[in-house]
From Swiss-Prot:
Residues 168-171 are annotated as: G4. Residues 25-239 form the tr-type G domain. This is Sulfate adenylyltransferase subunit 1. It comes from Escherichia coli (strain 55989 / EAEC). The gene is cysN. GO terms for molecular function: ATP binding; GTP binding; GTPase activity; sulfate adenylyltransferase (ATP) activity. Residues 34-41 are annotated as: G1.
Amino acid sequence: MNTALAQQIANEGGVEAWMIAQQHKSLLRFLTCGSVDDGKSTLIGRLLHDTRQIYEDQLSSLHNDSKRHGTQGEKLDLALLVDGLQAEREQGITIDVAYRYFSTEKRKFIIADTPGHEQYTRNMATGASTCELAILLIDARKGVLDQTRRHSFISTLLGIKHLVVAINKMDLVDYSEETFTRIREDYLTFAEQLPGNLDIRFVPLSALEGDNVASQSESMPWYSGPTLLEVLETVEIQRVVDAQPMRFPVQYVNRPNLDFRGYAGTLASGRVEVGQRVKVLPSGVESNVARIVTFDGDREEAFAGEAITLVLTDEIDISRGDLLLAADEALPAVQSASVDVVWMAEQPLSPGQSYDIKIAGKKTRARVDGIRYQVDINNLTQREVENLPLNGIGLVDLTFDEPLVLDRYQQNPVTGGLIFIDRLSNVTVGAGMVHEPVSQATAAPSEFSAFELELNALVRRHFPHWGARDLLGDK
């Protein structure tokens, strides 16, 4: 146990009191992103070091690793605390998304250290999908680069509203206020292309020296704003899902005995209370909430993000993938939608292809009707393309095999976020954010039966040399 943790436990009056205090702290998930060698891993290492989250044996190992792999001469190479893969240490870069956890007296944190290289865009999108704040590192010597713009775009595309522009390596430009001001103005000019409801803050710092990371810098008296840690501790995160209507995707039907039938899942948005009238989609059947069951016993109400089991007053047909919402809300099912797609497979996404998709616990199929455009994520321009390559981001039109109940991703990431699954290999090949549900569901009959579709998939998987075409994708 490190000395800082031991002191915190002593101050709280014991382990149990400390654990209770930890449970009631707010949690902030954030990611660090920037161009290669901007100091992302060093910054996280500095945060862990200066908040005294490193154990003595880790510190001793860090001294030895700094001599073997370090790039900072006689100084501690704090990036080695985060760059865990052997390939990362040898190359001095970050490849995979590395998660780290730490806490202060005010808040708990989960950090995602995401790769800066363009070929790892899919890794960054994965890390950003669960975060509420993004730290965008900029090398003070280089200013705003294409990768800075790319990371800003991806962060906002995935719903992040709080951006902290950390202008790093100020020690290498003699802590120049003019350099900081110029980069700040350049970024604000670029940010005019981003959504207008963003909270953007700027902090000049040196992750290597510790200036303005966890403590105020004496080398930059011209900067009177908060340190990076103070920003992280005090930023107010207002979750969009709290103000949205009730959405409860059913993950599991729990029937341990003949006297109990409950529907388990995580409340995606809004709130639910005992006695509330709810509607099941897509069937449209209505009922009342009889009980809200949790691990700690029954509750009278539940809020977004809580894992609960709902018991209804009526015995109705509900299965995994169905959606419960307030009975008085009119939410039509849709057969198609425009979707922002981050493509993650070597084989490009092309019109006419079909994939399994998974959204809020429901699995179905979708066909790619067309690609409206691909976004050049370096300058945010749009261009027409025939297919979407690996790490490409674009707006795609999808038609679903059955009616779905969708929200826009910016309103509800759970009922607006989906993944693409290759039907032969069962590998996740893309991530999608619903841009707009575009048409109401129609009762058009299917050309092929479910048995024929399953048989077709089986033949193409085990007998590819037969050359059987995909009945859904017509390829």
